[in-house]
Amino acid sequence: MANETQKVGAIHFPFPFTPYSIQEDFMAELYRVLEAGKIGIFESPTGTGKSLSLICGALSWLRDFEQKKREEEARLLETGTGPLHDEKDESLCLSSSCEGAAGTPRPAGEPAWVTQFVQKKEERDLVDRLKAEQARRKQREERLQQLQHRVQLKYAAKRLRQEEEERENLLRLSREMLETGPEAERLEQLESGEEELVLAEYESDEEKKVASRVDEDEDDLEEEHITKIYYCSRTHSQLAQFVHEVKKSPFGKDVRLVSLGSRQNLCVNEDVKSLGSVQLINDRCVDMQRSRHEKKKGAEEEKPKRRRQEKQAACPFYNHEQMGLLRDEALAEVKDMEQLLALGKEARACPYYGSRLAIPAAQLVVLPYQMLLHAATRQAAGIRLQDQVVIIDEAHNLIDTITGMHSVEVSGSQLCQAHSQLLQYVERYGKRLKAKNLMYLKQILYLLEKFVAVLGGNIKQNPNTQSLSQTGTELKTINDFLFQSQIDNINLFKVQRYCEKSMISRKLFGFTERYGAVFSSREQPKLAGFQQFLQSLQPRTTEALAAPADESQASTLRPASPLMHIQGFLAALTTANQDGRVILSRQGSLSQSTLKFLLLNPAVHFAQVVKECRAVVIAGGTMQPVSDFRQQLLACAGVEAERVVEFSCGHVIPPDNILPLVICSGISNQPLEFTFQKRELPQMMDEVGRILCNLCGVVPGGVVCFFPSYEYLRQVHAHWEKGGLLGRLAARKKIFQEPKSAHQVEQVLLAYSRCIQACGQERGQVTGALLLSVVGGKMSEGINFSDNLGRCVVMVGMPFPNIRSAELQEKMAYLDQTLSPRPGTPREGSGGEPVHEGRQPVHRQGHQAPEGFCQRSAPGPAICPAPCPGQAAGLDPSPCGGQSYLWPRHCCCAEVSPGEVGLFLMGNHTTAWRRALPLSCPLETVFVVGVVCGDPVTKVKPRRRVWSPECCQDPGTGVSSRRRKWGNPE
């Protein structure tokens, strides 16, 4: 259908077809939020075209914003002077170009001529800035139109070259000093390629101030960042689907879009990509950039040059001229990550760095959560949020994502292994290291020793054979942990900065990679014990290569130094005392014991985003309870309540086309209670299997069944296999199980889809497929099981967290202490058992955390075509003391038995499913949902005209159904 322009109020929204009314409301509210610079929480259910509404609404605002900015600039440039603030366009003043130029209050009693002079000067300065900005924009647009191949940012290469020259001078000086001493023989041994493993001289504190000023001067040479929109989502597949939606939108041909990703996703160097581990890929990439300058530096020294090239070659794809070409190509036409990767291979340019070069001139930047929410990653990628717009999609798990991203866990074996490696490194190169390097290395060794001691172990013994006298879990504040570990006198900020600047973890990995198997035979006997200990912790390469090539085991193929991981724990210990806790988990042996930093206040990492950005939009299909975002994330980040705007809309599916059904008891009248105490009972697992057998017998196509956890799915699967229920299920549906490995998900889904298609054509005894999945896993979001792929979705129990978990209890206590209690009524959209203080019930915020976590983890339903009447099969009506309402308010539901579900599916519409409960069902009655779509081929007759799956368009209304094929995120 041709693109249409919808006018909502005075705003024109280009749209590829006639939008729903809720989409018009969505775009209008989004426009107002961006214009006013507020924080918006948008809730739009699955299947309502949320992505397209975000695209058209946000890009319409950006179009109008740039137009107003050009008009204002033209007016000021034409008159030469003018009011610096316009009432209508006050928000327009406009970008950083108008910062501080106007509205500066003058001291009272100042002469009028002084005030007039200052005002005129400010106006002239503003006009000069506008002229410069206009010239820069014109130059940028010309470059994009003509695709000129210019090499920019040469200062980066110059800077790296200077660093390498300094390092070479230091190494040459060290060799001259030692070549006549007792270490001369050993020095000759080091010249066979070990120079790259030696730490360069480290400067800190005042010594770094001069270098920082140089860095600031170089930063001025970077290209200016225009006003843009940063769109982020959880997975790369969701980002790819969003880019495809942008291509199909009316803005697809004009918008300048760039997709960002990790080195693991964008690397085109097969030698580097084959390393597998993300950390190893990152480190090798940086090392290869540095080695390209060593190659040039050693041109006149033939032998050293050959030795360095044999060890590590420069990356042929890191070429500024080719990356500039890739940048221009990426901005000239919308490309997803796969197209960017193909372009990089064709142009022999690095897509990772080429896409980063495109950020300043891009209007829409698409990136994963981690690159936006992690400050260090954001800074390294060159992302600047000042006065920009950020849209966070699929944000229902935003709080948990930030918490998990900044929580770090290290094991006793990792601590011992890092200590052993670092001690051998110091023994090997200690004579060549400067005093400041040795000081910091000894501090790191001391920290590792104390971390092991606080767990109750001995750093000098093998952690696999050490048994701890005390076991259990202990939780401490950060300060208490530092005092107990006796490391409160060490400046962790300096240690963290040293680890980052000196790249000690990278040097240490290179050292262990080189000498992991042969070092002990070449050293003195006193080091043989350390090397033997290291080998006992780290398997040989041949043994690792024989392991299965699973993603979960990818890191074991080429293990990175554990110091890389421990650096994250050291950085976490610099968090404010009240914002985190340290959990000491002492198990049977030291190797299994762990130290974990638990972030309690995710707002400290989100505060910088909301403070710098012009506007932030948090969107998702199910954002309830919204109060969690308001209180735990925004209020704690310093956002005023008046700045937060909420928007929520219903579904486009008519209520008579979707009907959730809750199964409270099984075939043998066994009550379904999937609590931690009862869900592992054999009769409970048997009852679930019998219910699924009956459902699979009458439901055509695909059935998707979600379990609360991988462990419970494993237990149920093993029990069914032992009791024969798995064979009964396999006779009706081919069974697929969600893999734990991410790279196997596509293979499983493809086989699942092909099986259903084949069964639909053959019409044999096997009528489809059954997919066993896990809530919060790789199938729970971002994938649409449309048409026959999702005829029935069943939820077994609810993914409540373990209430006895020390982490959860500490989070609950933190919320109780931090968030002010609200007497009387509970928060909207969440529950929690009231705690009575005197005669007044008080709903504790912490007691509501388990239900909020459960609600955010539950998967969204599979949305079926509007004319197909849908039903839901849910298991487990387990009672709960709270009064939460977890059910979507636009759905209706009924409590039925498995027999009634079967009768309905076979065409009997007079069963108890018509006893619909209120639209908001209390938690005691409704726990679980799954959608069963009636097959148009069977006796279930649709109440409206059937839509064509090919065009996905209602012939009666001409409105798109917003459904996408399997494999694409919503």
Curated annotation (Swiss-Prot):
It holds the Pfam family Helicase_C_2. GO terms for biological process: cellular response to bleomycin; cellular response to cisplatin; cellular response to hydroxyurea; DNA damage response; DNA repair; establishment of sister chromatid cohesion; negative regulation of protein binding; nucleolar chromatin organization. It catalyses: Couples ATP hydrolysis with the unwinding of duplex DNA at the replication fork by translocating in the 5'-3' direction. This creates two antiparallel DNA single strands (ssDNA). The leading ssDNA polymer is the template for DNA polymerase III holoenzyme which synthesizes a continuous strand; ATP + H2O = ADP + phosphate + H(+). A motif (DEAH box) lies at residues 393-396. Its cofactor is Mg(2+); [4Fe-4S] cluster. Keywords: 4Fe-4S, Activator, ATP-binding, Chromosome, Cytoplasm, Cytoskeleton, Developmental protein, Disease variant, DNA damage, DNA repair, DNA replication, DNA-binding, Helicase, Host-virus interaction, Hydrolase, Iron, Iron-sulfur, Isomerase, Metal-binding, Nucleotide-binding, Nucleus, Phosphoprotein, RNA-binding, Transcription, Transcription regulation. The modification Phosphoserine is found at residue 262. Transmembrane segments: none annotated. Induction: Up-regulated by serum (at protein level). Up-regulated by fibroblast growth factor FGF7. Expressed in keratinocyte growth factor-stimulated cells but not in EGF and IL1-beta-treated keratinocytes. Up-regulated with progression from noninvasive to invasive melanoma. InterPro entries: ATP-dep_Helicase_C (IPR006555), DinG/Rad3-like (IPR045028), Helic_SF1/SF2_ATP-bd_DinG/Rad3 (IPR014013), Helicase-like_DEXD_c2 (IPR006554), P-loop_NTPase (IPR027417), RAD3-like_helicase_DEAD (IPR010614), Rad3/Chl1-like (IPR013020). GO terms for cellular component: centrosome; chromatin; cytoplasm; extracellular exosome; midbody; nucleolus; nucleoplasm; spindle pole. It is found in: Nucleus; Nucleus, Nucleolus; Cytoplasm, Cytoskeleton, Spindle pole; Midbody. It is linked to Warsaw breakage syndrome: A syndrome characterized by severe microcephaly, pre- and postnatal growth retardation, facial dysmorphism and abnormal skin pigmentation. Additional features include high arched palate, coloboma of the right optic disk, deafness, ventricular septal defect, toes and fingers abnormalities. At cellular level, drug-induced chromosomal breakage, a feature of Fanconi anemia, and sister chromatid cohesion defects, a feature of Roberts syndrome, coexist. DNA-dependent ATPase and ATP-dependent DNA helicase that participates in various functions in genomic stability, including DNA replication, DNA repair and heterochromatin organization as well as in ribosomal RNA synthesis. Its double-stranded DNA helicase activity requires either a minimal 5'-single-stranded tail length of approximately 15 nt (flap substrates) or 10 nt length single-stranded gapped DNA substrates of a partial duplex DNA structure for helicase loading and translocation along DNA in a 5' to 3' direction. Associates with the CTF18-RFC complex. Associates with a cohesin complex composed of RAD21, SMC1 proteins and SMC3. Interacts with CHTF18. Interacts with DSCC1. Interacts with FEN1; this interaction is direct and increases flap endonuclease activity of FEN1. Interacts with PCNA. Interacts with POLR1A and UBTF. Interacts with RAD21, SMC1 proteins and SMC3. Interacts with RFC2. Interacts with TIMELESS; this interaction increases recruitment of both proteins onto chromatin in response to replication stress induction by hydroxyurea. (Microbial infection) Interacts with bovine papillomavirus type 1 regulatory protein E2; this interaction stimulates the recruitment of E2 onto mitotic chromosomes. This is ATP-dependent DNA helicase DDX11. The lineage of its organism: Eukaryota, Metazoa, Chordata, Craniata, Vertebrata. The gene is DDX11.
